[in-house]
């Protein structure tokens, strides 16, 4: 179940206040649980899977540092994005104009489909409604 809340924001152009939905920060699902779940379905020991994931991470980092995008089959792909300061002309641009590199993950088609609002397995609940339901069972 995914929880969301409504945030009030003022539109800087029209100065009208509007409400927008935001996902409530999710509780992290630890790697150890993912490894345990995968190992239940495969003939592999948890330490072997953790070792493979460790080296997978190293290879992804190395490939990104070498300028490649990295595709992980039906999971998706990673690539780097560069952030810089805007300058009026090419001549004004220097290495100091560069701000940061950001790692981007783009899910593959199947993952996008599985995590879309049209999928019946994706359940969204407004946080305040979820809390009201939880409180009803505790009333005396």
Q: What label would you give each PLM region?
A:
Residues 1-51, 55-140:
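Strongly charged
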């Amino acid at each position: 179940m995914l929880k969301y809340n409504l945030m009030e924001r003022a539109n800087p152009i029209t100065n009208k206040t509007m409400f927008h939905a935001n996902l409530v920060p999710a509780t992290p699902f630890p790697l150890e649980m993912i490894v345990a779940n995968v190992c239940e379905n495969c003939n592999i020991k948890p330490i072997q899977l953790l070792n493979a994931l460790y080296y997978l991470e190293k290879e992804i980092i190395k490939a990104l540092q070498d300028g490649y995008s990295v595709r992980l089959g039906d999971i998706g792909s990673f690539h780097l994005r560069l952030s810089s300061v805007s300058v009026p002309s090419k001549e004004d641009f220097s290495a100091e104009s560069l701000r940061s590199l950001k790692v981007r993950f783009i899910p593959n088609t199947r993952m996008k489909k599985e995590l879309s609002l049209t999928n019946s397995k994706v359940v969204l609940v407004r946080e305040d409604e979820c809390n009201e339901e939880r409180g009803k069972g505790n009333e005396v």
